[in-house]
Amino acid sequence: MASTSEEGRMYDKCVIGYWVPERKRQKFNWTDFENICESEGFRLKMIDMNLSFETQGPLHVFLHKLTDMQSHAESGDKNAEDIVSRLQEYIAKHPDLIIIDPLDNIRNLSNRYKSYEFIQEGIRFKDIFTPNFVEIKSRNVHEIASTLKKRGIKYPFVCKPLLAYGSSNAHKMMIIFNERDLKDCQLPCVAQDFINHNAILYKLFVVGDRFHVVERPSFKNFYEEDCNSLSTIFFNSHDISKSCSRSKWSILSEEDIPLTVKPNYQIFETIVKNIREIFGLILVGIDVVIENHTGKYAIIDVNVFPGYDGYPNFFEHLIDSIKKLLVERENFRQISKSCTLKKCQSDDLDSGFESDEKKKYSTK
């Protein structure tokens, strides 16, 4: 294990390269991160994605929010394709570079249907689940109704864009209450069971092996009679769950107020541990609701490098995570070096033994 003085020397030469959209940097007050990096002995360097990465190196850590760039590349945008391709080449040439977070791992969250499949396959706890879901591929109302029925999706359900990022529409969603409004589905999309959760959304903001839970407003409970009387609710998921949101759809009836379930933070810990294992991410946000009556925990979405609103000491925890990754990398190097040395010594001994044996037999 590296000593404190060794760690200090390690960080003095460490360059954290980053590319984060300006809007996100302003929201985070990026100057605070620059100051923390400087005080911890790191050098923070903004990377120009249009220039050669080699000429901007050497880099020890690359921190990024390239979800939109990746999405555009996958959609055929030539400039985005070139940037992502050059970055992947640079990463391949520098296997010791720490990426927060790996591009392939992030890609697993680009498609909501596939990400829900990953969660469904990876979560094996009776009190934790992802709501029933299905991809809608047809605009025909009767075909949509048939697909929902086969999958056991009941009204109301949430209709979400298939792509989780890369478009301004990624957070434009709707709650559909009946078959007559299936025409409102915007393809490509995923239908997900709506879970009654007493208008409380829990955002689990994860930074490495730490996390913080923020309670946000959400949708009130909907019942069978609502399916007859209500039309589609169109909403932006960012707006409905803002801390300052005052939507009429978040106001509980008096009889529903006692249904609120007090959260169990040990279950949140289990969710965080499992989602990190499933997706292999350092910076991730997990949206969780607690189902009324059953008290089960529903994972309704997972997001890459979220906003972290309400997360105290985010930059300090990020730097701590980077330090831990650097120490783990250094320990791995030392172990690899030790194993290589032992193998060389073993090979030398074997070679000597073989040589002596050959001499012995050659004299007979």
Residue ranges and their predicted role:
Residues 37-57, 140:
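A short, well-structured beta->alpha microelement
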Residues 24-30:
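Short N-terminal binding/cap micro-motifs at the start of the first secondary-structure element
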Residues 1-20, 56, 66-70, 80, ...:
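Active-site nucleotide/adenylate-binding loops and adjacent lid/helix of ATP-dependent enzymes
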Residues 31-35:
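Short amphipathic alpha-helix
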Residues 19-22, 48:
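Short beta-strand/turn micro-motifs composed of small residues
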Residues 260-364:
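ATP-dependent carboxylate activation and anion-phosphoryl transfer catalytic cores
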Residues 58-62:
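Conserved acidic residues
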